[in-house]
């Protein structure tokens, strides 16, 4: 019985990971600049975290059945983290949208996005 419980828990974790959406924030800044990150939705808060140069942070989450899942993020860098940008880091567009992984890269000249679909379409 204990083995069955463990198997069920592992199965739910794997299925949740496979079917979930997510955000990836990567630090591609130069000159050893650290990246401060904080993201939030209606129900969750991620961070604040410090991402080292060349580092990244993955956050996977399930979307709601009403297709209203949205995450907002703030990234800060520079002396005393004075330079900052607020943006919508994840948003569903319809009930049939699974979201995929929104891959953000912070660079010296801006913040760049690549959306990776979960169904093998890039």
UniProtKB/Swiss-Prot annotation:
Localization per Swiss-Prot or TrEMBL: Secreted
Glycosylated residues (UniProt): 86
What biological processes does GO assign it?
rejection of self pollen
Q: Which interval of the chain is the signal sequence?
A: 1-20
InterPro entries (alphabetical): Self-incomp_S1
Superkingdom is Eukaryota
Q: What is its main location?
A: secreted
Gene Ontology cellular component terms for the protein in this record: extracellular region
Keyword presence, Ribonucleoprotein: no
Keyword terms of this UniProt record = Glycoprotein, Secreted, Self-incompatibility, Signal
Q: Which family does it belong to?
A: Belongs to the plant self-incompatibility (S1) protein family.
> What is the recorded name of this protein?
S-protein homolog 23
Organism source for this protein? Arabidopsis thaliana
